[in-house]
From Swiss-Prot:
Residues 1063-1074, 1096-1141 have a biased composition (Acidic residues). It is an enzyme of class 2 (transferase). This is DNA-directed RNA polymerase subunit beta. One of its GO terms (biological process) is DNA-templated transcription. CDD domains: RNA_pol_B_RPB2 (cd00653). The keyword Transferase applies. Belongs to the RNA polymerase beta chain family. Residues 1063-1141 are annotated as: Disordered. One of its GO terms (molecular function) is DNA-directed RNA polymerase activity.
């Protein structure tokens, strides 16, 4: 039966039966450890590899002696505020030696600012938090494969893949001869390569391979006699068309495989070859320290061929490239090292060139070294690499999962198009290393995964998972834990975590389920070598948060794991009644909660900070984040959960972050649900909710948008941020301060001015009156136009923060920018029809109706149901976890407790029934419900209980959109598409068919002309509507003119004829239209003027022919849709979440 355990700051009753012998590791250590390795070891390796740099004569030598990272210039928060990169200066001590004079110069050289990792495992690049995702790549080493050729004979192949350098491929043909390809060139008999390596006689070659018949076959095809001939033959293949000499051929072969600068197996490659061939070559001594041999050796090539012969004899099996023993992880550290290496190599070239050009006597290290290529390489990696991604910060789980993500995409990895089914599939070696459930749906399925809970990365980048060792002599499962890689694991028999043990650790059953070499077998207990440490060892963090996962279909569990990452942090958080016991670890390691660093007593608590007096008398201050905007526009807000005078211990949670409650992850709310249909409102996954959820702010979330406005220098003079805006009433300016910037706390609606800004306008011809005024008053009539920052369509809220940066105050701004203003607007979004909600079991739906509380079905005691879900959503989807959760949630709520039911080790049906009995509820969990409208009971008992529901980030407020007039595409003159462009709805081919089917001719004509791209017609229509006249006849649509022009450009003379066979002129120019549109304040030509100079209205003396007696001055400006500057501030979000979802 359940027993209580402490999780975070609360107690949960857990149903776990298996004792966990191993603590979960820190969940973001994969990021931290890798970066730490780079700072401590990776950089040193790089400088060691490149040093010394010599000039072409060997006289000057440049050595890199040591390096150090300084202190960052700004703190993390300042970097976010100022759009800076959180980085520390990298200084390198460099020594320049002149061999002739014996002179030595030492200098410390600054090598650029190096981005630092924050405690949370992220980087701050240009003010945005980013994550470097770990990449799964094929490990260097030797790989063997077998296949069948066209004639049906078995053929075999071997490939030696280095970290960088030329590939070496061996293959057989149907005559059982062995051939080799060097760096993807044409194949040659393998004996030619052996001769070139110095095994020059046939006898020596045969002796190497115990006079194997297949080598004899190959020798018969080999037309070379000596080492020299063999070298020349290889040279001809690799460099066709160049005159071959023996020396150049020898140098080529040397540099291809035996020169550490051109060929690198890496420590990993050497280790893999060592393991595969079991030969002794692993390290050699260099400068008194052991180093891995990172190039090929002649022995490696011979062993590779010997192994291929064994494969042909059937002694060994071919390799499986999707096995995690053959795929490794490149984490942050290694990715950075590779990038840095590219920069250093470019720098090395520059140094060599400068050594020859500069005067030897005055030369210093500082002069030689150009750090540009190094800085550029790092900048490029963090800014635009596919693996450097804008952090998903929707909620703490999304952050945590993003840092634990494994991607097979990216440079040096796979591409989406090329990846087949095998790579994407779940593999037996994933067990305990990579989650079989959490992966995106869509084109990236299986290419992006998530690290399992207990997995860790070893020094070679292979994923290891822990197992408890079995003492075979005593037959006891010990608490000693060994971490095994995927290829080591295949050799052992490994029992499951749920195999029953007695107190001492003996297996209770004679035969147990065990995994061995990718198979699941039933073996005698005495044969078992290892045992799983925990049932949740095979799944990732997000999957481990799904209660009753064992009762859900895998496809739905996948959606459940992915949708938890999209849950919006709510205004009032609440931890789940039915959890898995993993919640507090996820919250703690995500870094969104505040932990006490030392033991002590709380001295002072305010909303903004917590002060603790530690046991040794020091005061420690913890600053809390208040209403900060996350990358996804959700709200980050930390709240203290300790009181003054309370005693805290090190590691205790003292403040909750977003989506946490008492130190536990709390992504949603516990809601009373009933599984029943209600008047068809929950047909097809629709959800019916009670108005209580709206009134009591149960699913209310806060969203913060950031708007920015900068004042630049233009050709006509500087822009100015000011309150003095032309043609704007005082009423519109009421919330602006004297600088012209909105005050904090102001409530704003679409179209309100946030920052007043004016831009100088070009000089125009002056009228006689203006010239007279100018002559009298001598002042130039202010020629500026209003380019203020306004609230976009569909947005509103309350201004919560304003930040102003200016050149004068010494802030670093982009070139040409004098002042930058950022305005933050927060909105409270209550749950509304059209919002998407989901449970944790992949049960998602859209809200279709919000019913008054009194109309909802109610329990016998009068409690109204809060959400009504459709029971038909359960059987076909096979996610029964939601039903069990509902039952257990009801019992736990009645007993006043919270429970934990860990994955694969949770509550059984019997235990749930027992909980019902304790709570005095019927065992089937069903209740008679009454209709809230009539008070009549429904005709059968209904399943009712508490389910944990999430509100997802797909909110209807972000998707709803309407347009009257707005920007048009330049070429077709049709309205742009999409909400971001303030576009229209596309009325496509099929929609046209629908109207044709109904014979709605006029509607159709209007849609295809005046509502879209009939440039003349749409202005005249607007005019007619404004004046209340009849709408004129439509003209020729612009896209038709484009079609005609395209046909003419193909050399076809296409004319348009009227009914009377007269040619219709398609005019080039619609100046008159522009003119009348300008008067109307409409912009008819393409995307609204982006260049300030091209203001219309100076078309000299053309009169508006559209309608002489129409005076735009009669119009009230507020009625017009002025869209001159709609596109001026149109920014496409530069981070559309990397290449991920």
């Amino acid at each position: 039966m359940a027993y209580p355990v402490k999780v975070g700051a609360r107690e949960r009753w857990t149903f776990a039966k298996i004792k966990e012998t191993l603590e979960l590791p820190n969940l973001i250590e994969i990021q931290r450890n890798s970066y730490q390795w780079f700072i401590d070891t990776g950089l040193r390796e790089l400088f060691h590899d490149i040093s010394p740099i010599q000039d072409f004569t060997g006289n000057l030598i440049l050595q890199f002696v040591d390096y150090s990272l300084g202190e960052p210039k700004y703190s993390e928060d300042e970097c976010k505020e100022r759009d800076m990169t959180y980085a520390a200066p990298l200084r390198v001590k460099v020594r320049l030696i002149n061999r002739e004079t014996g002179e030595v110069k030492e200098q410390e050289v600054f090598m650029g600012d190096f981005p630092l990792m924050t405690d949370k495992g992220t980087f701050i690049i240009n003010g945005a938090e980013r994550v470097i995702v770990s990449q799964l790549v094929r490990s260097p080493g030797a790989y063997y494969a077998e296949g069948i050729d066209a004639s049906g004979t078995k053929v075999y192949g071997a490939t030696v893949i280095p970290n960088r350098g030329a590939w070496l491929e061996f293959e057989t043909d149907n005559t059982e001869s062995i051939y080799v390809r060097i760096d993807r060139t044409r194949k040659i008999p393998v004996t030619i390569l052996l001769r070139a390596l110095g095994y020059n006689t046939n006898a020596r070659i045969l002796e190497l391979f115990d006079y194997d018949g297949r080598i004899q076959n190959t020798l018969e095809k080999d037309n070379t006699e000596s080492e020299e001939e063999a070298l020349v033959e290889i040279y001809k293949r690799l460099r066709p068309g160049e005159p071959p000499t023996v020396d150049s051929a020898r140098n080529l072969l040397e540099s291809l495989f035996f020169d550490p600068r051109r060929y690198d197996l890496g420590n990993v490659g050497r280790y893999k070859l060592h393991k595969k061939f079991n030969h002794g070559i692993l390290t050699r001594e260099v400068d008194g320290r052991e180093e891995y041999i990172r190039t090929l050796t002649k022995e490696d090539i011979i062993y590779t061929i010997k192994y291929l012969l064994r494969l042909m004899d059937g002694e060994v099996k071919p390799d499986d490239i999707d096995h995690l023993g053959n795929r490794r992880l490149r984490s942050v550290g290694e990715l950075l090292q590779n990038q840095f290496r590219i920069g250093l190599a470019r720098m090395e070239r520059v140094v060599r060139e400068r050594m020859t050009i500069q005067d030897v006597d005055v030369i210093t290290p500082q002069v030689l070294i150009n750090i540009r290529p190094v800085v550029a390489a790092i900048k490029e990696f963090f800014g635009s690499s596919q693996l450097s991604q804008f952090m998903d910060q929707t909620n703490p789980l999304a952050e945590l999962t993003h840092k634990r993500r494994l991607s097979a995409l990216g440079p040096g990895g796979l591409s989406r198009e090329r990846a087949g089914f095998e790579v994407r599939d779940v593999h037996t070696s994933h067990y305990g290393r990579m989650c079989p459930i959490e992966t995106p749906e869509g084109p990236n399925i299986g290419l992006i995964g998530s690290l399992s809970t207990y997995a860790r990365i070893n020094e070679f980048g292979f994923i290891e998972t822990p197992y408890r060792r079995v003492d075979k002599e005593k037959g006891i499962v010990t608490n000693q834990v060994d971490y095994l890689t995927a290829d080591e694991e295949d050799k052992y028999f490994i029992a499951q975590a749920n195999a029953p043990l007695d107190e001492e650790g003996h297996f209770l059953e004679k035969r147990v389920n065990a995994r061995h070499g990718g198979e699941i077998l039933v073996v005698p207990a005495s044969q078992v070598d290892y045992m799983d440490v925990s049932p949740k060892q095979m799944v990732s963090v997000a999957t481990a948060l799904i209660p009753f996962l064992e009762h859900d279909d895998a496809n739905r569990a996948l959606m459940g794991a992915n949708m938890q990452r999209q849950a919006v942090p709510l205004l009032r958080t609440e931890a789940p009644i039915v959890g898995t016991g993993m919640e507090w670890r996820a919250a703690r390691d995500s870094g969104t909660v505040v932990l006490a660093r030392n033991n002590g007593v709380v001295e002072r608590v305010t909303a903004r900070e917590i002060v603790i007096r530690t046991d040794n008398g020091h005061l420690e201050t913890y600053r809390l984040q208040k209403f900060v905007r996350s990358n996804q526009g959700t709200c980050i807000n930390q709240k203290p959960i300790v009181r003054k005078g309370e005693r805290v211990s090190a590691g205790q949670t003292i403040a909750d972050g977003p989506s946490t409650d008492q130190g536990e992850l709390a992504l949603g709310r516990n809601i009373l649900v009933a599984f029943m249909t209600w008047e068809g409102y929950n047909y097809e996954d629709a959800i019916l909710i009670s108005e209580k959820l709206v009134k009591d702010d149960i699913f209310t979330s806060i969203h913060i948008e950031e708007y920015e406005c900068d004042a630049r220098d233009t050709k006509l003079g500087p822009e100015e941020i000011t309150r003095d805006i032309p043609n704007v009433s005082e009423d519109v300016l009421k919330d602006l301060d004297e600088r012209g910037i909105i005050r904090i706390g102001a409530e704003v609606r679409p179209g309100d001015i946030l920052v007043g800004k004016v831009t100088p306008k070009g000089e125009t011809e002056l009228t006689a009156e203006e010239r007279l005024l100018r002559a009298i008053f001598g002042e130039k009539a202010r020629e500026v136009r209003d380019t203020s920052l306004r609230v976009p369509h569909g947005e509103s809220g309350i201004v919560v923060d304003v930040k102003v940066f200016s050149r004068e105050n010494g802030d670093e701004l982009a070139p040409g920018v004098n002042e930058l203003v950022r305005v933050y607007i927060a909105q409270k979004r209550k749950i509304s029809v059209g919002d998407k909600m989901a449970g944790r079991h992949g049960n998602k739906g859209v809200i279709s109706r919000i019913l008054p509380e009194e109309d909802m079905p109610f329990l016998p005691d009068g409690t109204p149901i809060e959400i009504v879900l459709n029971p038909l959503g359960v059987p076909s989807r096979m996610n029964l976890g939601q039903i069990l959760e509902t039952h257990l949630g009801r019992a736990a709520r009645a007993l006043g407790i919270t429970v934990a039911t860990p994955v694969f080790d949770g509550a059984t049906e019997e235990e749930i029934k027992e909980a019902f009995r304790k709570a005095g509820l019927p065992e089937d969990g069903k209740t008679i419900l009454y209709d809230g409208r009539t008070g009549e009971p429904f005709d059968r008992p209904i399943t009712v209980g508490y389910m944990y529901m999430l509100k997802l980030a797909h909110l209807v407020d972000d998707k709803i959109h309407a347009r009257s007039t707005g920007p048009y595409s330049l070429v077709t003159q049709q309205p742009l598409g999409g909400k971001a462009q303030f576009g229209g709805q596309r009325f496509g081919e099929m929609e046209v068919w629908a109207l044709e089917a109904y014979g709605a001719a006029y509607t159709l004509q209007e849609i295809l002309t005046v509502k879209s791209d009939d440039v003349v017609g749409r202005v005249k229509t607007y005019e007619a509507i404004v004046k209340g006249e009849n709408v004129p006849e439509p003209g020729v649509p612009e896209s038709f003119k484009v079609l005609i022009k395209e046909l003419q450009s193909l050399g076809l003379d296409v004319k348009v004829l009227s009914e009377e066979n007269e040619e219709i002129e398609i005019k080039e120019d619609d100046d008159d239209v522009s003119e009348s549109a300008q008067e109307l304040g409409l912009d008819v030509h393409g995307q609204p003027n982006t260049a300030p100079e091209s203001e219309g209205g100076n078309e000299e003396d053309k009169e508006a022919e559209a309608d002489e007696d129409f005076d735009p001055a009669d119009l009230d400006p507020s009625e017009l849709e002025l869209d001159a500057d709609l596109n001026d501030d149109l920014v496409v979000p530069d981070e559309a979440y990397g290449d991920e979802e």
